[in-house]
Amino acid sequence: MQRFPDPLRRHPVTLPDGSPHRLTVFLKAAIDHPNIEVGDYAYASAFEEVEDWAACLAPYLYPGAPERLAIGRFAQIAAGVRFITASAYHPMGGVSAFPFRIFDPAQMQHYRGECAARGDTVIGPDVWIGHGARVMAGVTVGAGAIIGAEAVVTRDVPPYAVVAGNPARVVRMRFGP
């Protein structure tokens, strides 16, 4: 009888020679970031070894940011996927899109407020995210959804939807009515 590996084991795949496949990780064991929550058995893969999975997947999410990233149980994340969290955005309502506020500690609180307004990014359980996809800030991806390779997800994805494209659109549902 096959057993599930320990969800806290960093490298869950064992190669035929007995060595761990270092390019696939259970994220719960690989990410230590105060703004990222990961469910059991969620995994990610890469084409080369990754030292900092939090920075790889969510490069703009800094500790203390007002937003968070939640990745559900059994989520599957392919190489090159990025979560573009709210801290990556630039102001667009003024004369310049340059983020002056991030360089002035006295103004940082205003920037944090703008980021918080976009909300958290939530990936439901059993979601499969294809190679190179981008998931933008504040998006919720429903349980069992599939995101196609290189898709740019700018809106919420319903449970069990298959989405593709830029911007991502529902191309079908995994299960019929």
Each PLM stretch: what is its role?
Residues 26, 36, 43-137, 174-175:
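Flexible, glycine/small-residue-enriched loop-and-beta-strand segment within the central core
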Residues 31, 95, 171:
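Short clusters of hydrophobic/aromatic residues that line enzyme substrate/ligand-binding pockets
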Residues 117, 132-145, 151-154:
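Beta-rich strand-turn-strand
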Residues 169-177:
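Short, intrinsically disordered, charge-balanced linker/junction segments flanking boundaries
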Residues 1-36:
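Extended, small-residue-rich solenoid/repeat segments and analogous flexible loops
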